[in-house]
Amino acid sequence: MKNYHHYYLPIQTHYLLDAYGNQRRVRILLPKDYEKHAQKHYPVVYMHDGQNVFYSKEAYSGHSWKLIPLLKQTTEFPDMLIVAIDNAGEARFDEYTPWPLSAENQTLIGFSGGAGQVYSEWVVTVVKPYIDAHYRTKPDREHTLCAGSSLGGLIVAYMGSAYPKVFGSLGIFSLASWVSEEAFLDFVSNHPLQKDTKVYIQVGTDEGNEVDQALLNKNSNQAYIDSSLWYYQTLLQGGHEMDYLWLRILADEQHFEKYWADHFGEFLAFSFAEK
């Protein structure tokens, strides 16, 4: 375990064996006064694509989610732990897709998909228990949040439905469920969330890129919007109350960490607001 201090907020690093026997980096951002309050327990936000969470220099796009300055500068949120789980590199696509892709998409993308169920089980049965055992968390679902973007958003939505008694708030940015839309919506329909689960759904109107367009028979910008709309509608049709849902379609925003970072504070405010 390594300990670093940046912006007066301590980050601790652990390496946990993943479902395939590989060492996976998991970092925990702690409140600055964590060591001073030995009896205090904290809510936890679990985030995927952990390489992109804290520092722009190691983020895939060159821009992180900027969570350290956000938490340092914002006083309206309760103190919390941020758990950043690194993705599996080249195996990221497989790990964040719960269902195998169609043969056509497998050929186009070069990945088969379908390892998301194993990954999700690892997060719930290995990572979360480890964090709860080694840190002063509030382990109940009300204080357990999960957030991610793109395919990371897909795995968040899946985990919310697969483990409704674990996660009380979901942050789903630029949902890329279009890679397996039918299977995704069918699963969500048949695995309802707890009635008070909060779901923040954000998508921009300029999400698509050339890679996405090559995989789709329609406008890739619209594909991302449709995925978010269909997910939102499926939750409503399943009886989820609108007060616990927040769908945001943001003009001109793109598939990029900058835009997710710009609104992460709003996800946290929504999650921690009293109903």
List each model region and its residues:
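Non-catalytic cap/lid and distal C-terminal segments of serine-dependent acyl enzymes
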Residues: M1-K275
